[in-house]
UniProtKB/Swiss-Prot annotation:
Lineage, top ranks: Bacteria, Pseudomonadati, Pseudomonadota, Gammaproteobacteria, Pseudomonadales
Catalysed reactions listed for this entry: beta-D-fructose 1,6-bisphosphate + H2O = beta-D-fructose 6-phosphate + phosphate
GO cellular component: cytosol
Gene: fbp
Protein name: Fructose-1,6-bisphosphatase class 1
Species annotation: Pseudomonas fluorescens (strain ATCC BAA-477 / NRRL B-23932 / Pf-5)
Subcellular location: Cytoplasm
Named cofactor requirement(s): Mg(2+)
Length: 336
């Protein structure tokens, strides 16, 4: 039986599910950019790409060299094809306008070019997260200049989302709104090949991911929930749990998608004015779309992530996502 490449899968989606050709082309271009980023990441010190730039992004985070390189790769790969009206990146202050010399399309691309970049110098997994939205009609005319407002759509409006994870293998995990597929990069072929046909998250779990060093800063519902997890089979949950933490959302969520679990990045008392740490548009929305399509759930502790109306490109949010039972439990504690 012949192997199904990403290109073949997308063509079959166009035939069977009427996936627009422009969306198919967009996903293929993003995938090619991810292959280029994977190549740059794999070179490491040999390519002179390790270390920091000495600059900060709009989030106030020190930019790694590969943050900037990955951002440029995605911009240059996607700006010319005629399938996008604009782009937004975690690494840029403002929305990216498609240069006037190129045709414009009906979609918006939002991305975190290199999630978990603090892991680069220690050779731990990193990844690229992306989300695709339709551009509102008023911005498709030549009379209305594209601005931030075009991107401020709730996660329910995503038409596609995915991530590439650069680890022992490079994988692309994708949803077009009809389940979650996983593609592994065959470096000899140069193609992403379908290896995980229907990714599903078990409803219950015995694993969780959280940065325990921040415990003293958590709100009471999170402290209560984690204490119950740590109590194991002698506690109220009556089973033992394992904790995992890679310090890259893309790696922690990938583990949860492939074998179940709960990922938590709650708000804390160090910055009480901020509702959380992770970015709604670049991280929480695409990952929540994937998790829900895989049968899981995702909330900010109070409401469904995908229902949140964004107020800014770089809005932050608390995140609890993964197996349904555990997400429901910790969300319920926030409501008590």
């Amino acid at each position: 039986m012949s192997r199904v490449t990403l290109s073949r899968y997308l063509i079959e989606q166009t035939r069977s599910n009427n996936t627009p050709a422009d969306l198919r082309f967009l996903i293929e271009v993003v995938a090619r950019a991810c292959k280029e980023i994977s190549h740059a990441v794999s070179k490491g010190a040999l390519g002179g790409v390790l270390g920091s730039m000495g600059t900060e992004n709009v989030q106030g985070e020190v930019q790694k060299k590969l943050d900037v390189i990955s951002n440029e790769i995605l911009l240059e790969a996607n700006e010319w094809g005629g399938h996008l009206a604009g782009m937004a990146s975690e690494e840029m202050d403002n929305a990216y306008q498609i240069p006037g010399k190129y045709p414009k399309g009906a979609y918006l691309l939002v991305f975190d070019p290199l999630d978990g970049s603090s892991n680069i110098d220690i050779n731990a997994p990193v990844g690229t997260i992306f989300s695709v939205l339709r551009c509102p009609n008023e911005y498709l005319s030549q009379n209305e200049a594209l601005n931030e407002k075009a991107f401020l759509q709730p996660g329910t409006q995503q038409v596609a989302a995915g991530y590439a994870i650069y680890g022992p293998q490079t994988m692309l995990v994708l949803t077009l709104g009809d389940g979650v597929k996983g593609f592994t990069l065959d470096r000899e072929m140069g193609s992403f090949v379908l290896t995980h046909e229907d990714i599903k998250i078990p409803e219950s779990t015995q694993e969780f991911a959280i940065n325990m060093s921040n415990e003293r800063h958590w709100e009471a519902p999170v402290k209560r929930y984690v204490e119950e997890l740590l109590a194991g089979d002698t506690g109220p949950l009556k089973k033992n749990y394992n904790m995992r933490w890679v310090a890259a959302m893309v790696a922690d969520v990938h583990r949860i998608l492939t074998r179940g679990g709960l990922f938590m990045y709650p708000r804390d008392s160090r910055e009480p004015e901020k509702p959380g740490k992770l970015r709604l548009m670049y991280e929480a929305n695409p990952m929540s779309f994937l998790v829900e399509q895989a049968g899981g759930a995702s909330t900010d502790g109070h409401k469904r992530i995908l229902d949140i109306q964004p107020e800014g490109l770089h809005q932050r949010v608390a995140v609890f996502l993964g197996s349904k039972e555990e997400v429901a439990r910790v969300t319920g504690y926030h409501k008590e």
